[in-house]
Amino acid sequence: MSVVTRFAPSPTGYLHVGGARTALYSWLVAKAQGGEFVLRIEDTDRERSTQPAIDAILEGMEWLGLSWDRGPYYQTQRFERYQELIDKLLEEDKAYKCYCSTERLEKMREEQMAAGEKPRYDGHCRDNPNVGGDKYVIRFRNPQDGSVVFDDHIRGRIEFANTELDDLIIARTDGTPTYNFCVVVDDWDMDITHVVRGEDHINNTPRQINILKALGAPVPQYAHVSMILGDDGKKLSKRHGAVSVMQYRDDGYVPEAVVNYLARLGWSHGDQEIFSRDELVEYFKLDDVNKAASAFNTEKLNWLNQHYMKTLPAEQVAPQLQWQFDQIGVDTSNGPALEQVVSLQADRVKTLKEMAAISRYFFESFDEFDEKAAKKHLRPVAKEPLVKAKELLGAISDWNAANIQAAINQTAADLDVGMGKVGMPLRVAATGGGNSPSLDVTLELIPQQTVLARIDLALEFIANRENA
């Protein structure tokens, strides 16, 4: 039997971290077995479902590299099929019309809660054909004896007594089918063999299994993934940082790091931390996913992100860095190749957003220096080293790191001063701040005439400081 998994988000918001992990696990199960991964948009909630949310989900999936083999399917395009099967259940007396008013149901629930009972439908219309009215819902006739048992890949054997389950509404008063019914029909029609989803769906599972059996459909295998917590042990929310997948793109994370991190968020393979996508496909097993909730650790994600920025081919990272520069309005058409910037800066930052922020001097002119760095290093004592450095740097005919370093060394030797007396003022002059990679390779990526002009700007700053 070919394995078919699915990811079935509701388009009522962005693709959040928990949903992305579920999608990844489903994708890995399919790819490991040479099966198919189906994308289904569960948009029956017409009031809350939006096209921007659908677009955000698709964008998030594409950014993570979770390509789907079939779909996206939309539940709102399948209402005829749902109605066909609802009619079938009605004809076979496996479903019935319920005319109970909202007032009656509310009163019933209040009385049940007052008596310390779990609120549930009391079956008033189940076997009462004389009840009538203009408005009705359709309820599934749930079995009243026996139990539903399924072996969850993550949680083991789970059993629900049918007496705990009331008769589920499968069609609303306006005729639209409900979530639990649509899911069942879709999983059947799309040949889904493995359902991977959040633990909040565990209570839906016995109801869905009963409907599947009533329809004569095969029952898929289930795996319910635990929730993701913040580092304080509470449910992950915006106060813990980004929860939208695309927010991580915006914040400068590479998709390889996010995929690696999400895979490890509740799953492990020995003590290995770094996984290529091929390794994830090879090693991932649902049975190895933890039952316990996982805590989101931003520091761990940052560590992974820096690892991937340093180890991925620079040409693969460069377009993502370009996107970050675009967001802050930096024109990179005049300046070094972004691959060079990536190689130079990757071990100095945790995100591409930080990399773009500290690399503006490669592409933009500036007329001010970092206040703290200038105060410390652009003092009158720095005037002579800067003048000498400008002279020797200006004499270079082949502008490269080796010749630049030789000029810096010669400046220090000619003035009989330590390298710091030359290097730090020159760094502030050339980059505008006190932090940069090694000065020789940094200056190599800045045009020679630009470096000389910036030294003049620094000398002017020192002169103004002396005259102040």
UniProtKB/Swiss-Prot annotation:
Give the organism the record lists.
Idiomarina loihiensis (strain ATCC BAA-735 / DSM 15497 / L2-TR)
Q: Where is this motif: 'KMSKS' region?
A: 235-239
* Role: Catalyzes the attachment of glutamate to tRNA(Glu) in a two-step reaction: glutamate is first activated by ATP to form Glu-AMP and then transferred to the acceptor end of tRNA(Glu).
State the encoding gene. Answer: gltX
Q: Where is this motif: 'HIGH' region?
A: 9-19
- Look at the named UniProt entry and state the broad enzyme category this protein falls under: ligase
Biological processes annotated in GO: glutamyl-tRNA aminoacylation
Report if keyword Cytoplasm is assigned. yes
Q: Provide the GO MF annotations for this entry.
A: ATP binding; glutamate-tRNA ligase activity; tRNA binding; zinc ion binding
* Compartments, record wording: Cytoplasm
Write down what this protein is called: Glutamate--tRNA ligase
Give the enzyme's EC designation: 6.1.1.17
- Cite the PANTHER family for this sequence: GLUTAMATE--TRNA LIGASE, GLUTAMATE--TRNA LIGASE, MITOCHONDRIAL-RELATED
Residues that, per the record, bind ATP: K238
* Cited Gene3D superfamilies: 1.10.10.350, HUPs
The entry's Zn(2+)-binding residues are C98, C100, C125, D127
